[in-house]
Design a protein with these regions (language model features):
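Short, surface-exposed "cap/lid" segments of acyl-processing enzymes
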Residues: 23-74
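C-terminal and inter-domain tail/linker signature
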Residues: 2-24, 68, 75, 82-86, ...
Length: 257
């Protein structure tokens, strides 16, 4: 590499992403701003199961929590837990609308990691389908018929186990079965049934499904990589190198967007 690449953001060397802590919106609803150097991104609502650890943290052994992982992807995240009230989806939407870092605000996504929460939230999601333009739901294969009848939002279904009949996708939906696992909590970090490789596959599928419908966020990954490798291997500036990386890289090189 002969010369410094174009700076990914601004006209100066990279600076670390400012630490962000989840902010409580109301009981059971938290807001986490984008953990990206860009600093803003579209809204993502997460329906998450309870964290049963005695001392919950956002990252453990290099594995981020659900909300942290999506914030590192550049989204502004509103997370809903089971102890939230019946108005949680609207409260989460309001928090995103009021957040300066949530931009644009007209196309938001939703991911459900807890089917009990989906049952409580489906009608609210449907009432906001002009704003919630895409969704993904993790469930058991046997639950597909029930949950798919509750929404008209374009949805990707991640199904644990093998269904007895062939699942058919539509113009507005995609269906993936994960026959090697029986638990729909396989994507939930810190759970006994968490399976890293399977979660990674489903996460990549979510990104491919969500980004065209939410108009991003898109990043110049080649430029980000060139900037990162320049500071590590040519400039050899530790501070600037670390500023191009996520908080706790889980492989040798994980540039932050």
């Amino acid at each position: 590499m002969a010369a410094i690449p174009e700076f990914a953001y601004g006209s100066s060397p990279p600076v670390p992403v400012a630490p962000q802590k989840p902010e409580q919106v109301t009981e059971g609803v938290t807001l986490l701003r984008p953990l990206s150097r860009r600093g803003h991104g579209p809204g993502m609502i997460i329906l998450a199961p309870n964290d049963e650890r005695a001392a919950p943290v956002e990252i453990q052994d290099g594995i981020p929590s659900l909300r942290m992982k999506w914030a590192e992807e550049g989204y502004c995240v509103a997370e809903i837990r089971p102890n939230a009230s019946s108005g949680a989806v609207k409260a989460a939407m309001q928090a995103l609308e009021n957040c300066a870092e949530c931009e644009p605000k007209d196309k938001m996504g939703l991911i459900c990691y807890d089917t009990d929460l989906w049952s409580k939230s489906a009608s609210a999601v449907e009432s906001l389908k002009d704003r919630i333009v895409v969704a993904a739901i993790y469930a058991k294969a046997s639950q597909l018929k029930q949950i798919s009848s509750q929404t008209s939002v374009p949805t990707m279904y991640h199904l644990a186990g093998k269904s007895e009949t062939k699942s058919t996708a539509t113009a507005n939906s995609k269906i993936y079965e994960y026959a090697t696992t029986e638990s729909s909590s396989f994507p939930v970090p810190f759970y006994e049934d968490f399976h890293y490789a399977t979660e990674a596959v489903s996460h990549s599928r979510n990104l491919a499904f969500f980004k065209p419908r939410m108009n991003g966020p898109y990043f110049d990954l080649e430029l980000l990589w060139d900037e990162h490798t320049y500071y590590e291997f040519e400039n050899r500036n530790v501070e600037h190198t670390m500023a191009t990386m996520v908080e706790e890289p889980y492989v040798n090189h994980v540039p932050t967007v």
